[in-house]
Amino acid sequence: MTRGALKVTILLVGLGLVLAGSRPISDCGERIEDDGYPMERHEVVTSDNYILTMHRIPYSPKTGESSNRPVAFLMHGMLSSSSDWVLMGPERSLAYMLADAGYDVWMGNARGNTYSKAHKYWPTYWQIFWNFSWNEIGMYDVPAMIDYVLAKTGQQQVQYVGHSQGTTVYLVMVSERPEYNDKIKSAHLLGPAAYMGNMKSPLTRAFAPILGQPNAIVEVCGSMEFMPSNKFKQDLGIEMCQATSPYADMCANEIFLIGGYDTEQLDYELLEHIKATSPAGASVNQNLHFCQEYNSGKFRKFDYTALRNPYEYGSYFPPDYKLKNAKAPVLLYYGANDWMCDVSDVRKLRDELPNMALDYLVPFEKWAHLDFIWGTEARKYVYDEVLKQMQSYE
């Protein structure tokens, strides 16, 4: 048997053990319960009929149930889900930290991801289901979830925390639906993704010049599912990305290639848990919209082509988002080694926000984009500061 064949055999045997035996928990709700916290699932229907699932940690077992708890609403990035906020476990994950601090924690899921692949009328195999970008997530999903949370809890406002695309959709919401500013106590944007003209991610830089140019082919391909999750891919990723696997470094480099190289903040024991939950799926158009942002250097709506734009917007070019409408307090947290959200782009955003409350460059030189959710010292360098700032608004 050749060495290559032997490696394949070992991999398939290991995969069989994963399929037959124990594996990291892939479901967010089950993971929360396994960690000893109370969990609720809630369904929300948007005004354009997408059915979304939220996960809730109503209180911490350390503090017990109480009434009138302030609300923290957490929103994930692209290809991610609510699982990101609990993946590192108690004491280390932001959702658990906030619950321990007395918050009623709600975690959203955008249309098209693992937990929100449903529509009142359209099955997911219809192309029209996937005809959205992060613009629609900001215009419809986040407002619908916030309205539901406020109605359910009786609170008047939420503390918003977003990572990556979770920051983008917040800015879309408050720019284009400014009435939602009144429902936000403060917005904590981790790795804020708005202006992206100086992005260093080699993947985006390689493909954006082609995929970020509107044309008929891109328009057709945009309304498709992008990197969906399924059990086979999860099991294969879990086996290949175990800390003891010969492929562990390859898995780590995949993460570094997206958000920036930082071995000091990556726990190799977490890799198989990441693969159990990510990627969580999205629409191709979400990725194309970010490619357009890189090409244009602007923070603006989706570019459908010069033929369709006049019908959609009344102009040949898509309009910029109205950041002047973002009146709720915004706190920016960003890293010097973030390949997705360059320091210069974040500071351009900072200078355009009318109510900037915090400019926080993470005091760790190699801090990268995905360290905000998976970094071993995320609590020390980011979450403690987020919690302190949130409490100042209570």
Swiss-Prot record:
Signal peptide annotation: 1-20
An example Gene Ontology molecular-function term: triacylglycerol lipase activity
Gene3D superfamilies xrefs: alpha/beta hydrolase
Active site: S164 (charge relay system), H369 (charge relay system)
EC numbers, comma separated: 3.1.1.-
Domain of life (superkingdom): Eukaryota
EC category name: hydrolase
Keyword annotations: Glycoprotein, Hydrolase, Lipid degradation, Lipid metabolism, Signal
Gene Ontology biological process terms from the UniProt entry: lipid catabolic process
Glycosylation sites: N131
InterPro entries registered for this protein in UniProt: AB_hydrolase_fold (IPR029058), AB_hydrolase_lipase (IPR006693), Lipase_euk (IPR025483)
Tissue localization of expression: Fat body.
PROSITE patterns: LIPASE_SER
A Pfam family this chain is assigned to: Abhydro_lipase
Family that this chain belongs to: Belongs to the AB hydrolase superfamily. Lipase family.
Protein name: Lipase 3
Originating organism: Drosophila melanogaster
